[in-house]
Amino acid sequence: MQKFGFYEKPPLDLASDEIMASGRYEGGELLSPGDSMDKVQVASMAFGQEQLLATPLQMALVAQSIANGGKMMKPYSVESVADYNGTIVKQARPAVWKTPIEPGTASDLKDMMVKVVNEGTGSKTKTSKVQMAAKTGTAEVTGRGPNAWFMGFAPADNPKYAIAVVVEDSDSGGGIAGPVMRETMLSALGL
């Protein structure tokens, strides 16, 4: 998880109190990655339960890393700033922030994520307009309905956008959040 930037705030151009680190929390406090866990906690964290807290930005960065062959790009919230004449005075520059996985691993994960859309739990996202690659998730929340998660990228063979969607107190990731991602992605791609 640390290789993907969990346990640290992403380098986003926002006030630091507006950014939350993803990771393992207890009682609202971010735990250290070195804090001990029992076998049940390790297993539960592996599929996104227990004390794991992830932000949509963090999960979009995970999807983006897979889309970019293992390289995680530094996120930015403003692409450019123009003066009153329309002249660009500040332009965001793409830069690698981390390399959490090897290219071969990213390729294998991409293939699996394409199958999620074409044959699996993300089939409600499938469209003839573009091949998407995605992963569903359903996070249990004590005292209310689950959080439906969906993260992915498109086009799968030449990614332009990575998106993560969470719909709180709802249903399954593929059933609820997947269609939201599909429509958002189609709009972003102009399709």
Model-derived features with residue positions:
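Short amphipathic alpha-helical face segments that pack within enzyme cores
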Residues: 55-61, 176-183
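Beta-lactam-recognizing serine transpeptidase/beta-lactamase-like catalytic domain environment
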Residues: 1-168
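Extracytoplasmic/secreted cell-surface and envelope-processing proteins
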Residues: 71, 172-176
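Short, gly/Ser/Thr-rich active-site loops of penicillin-recognizing serine hydrolases
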Residues: 87-95, 180-191
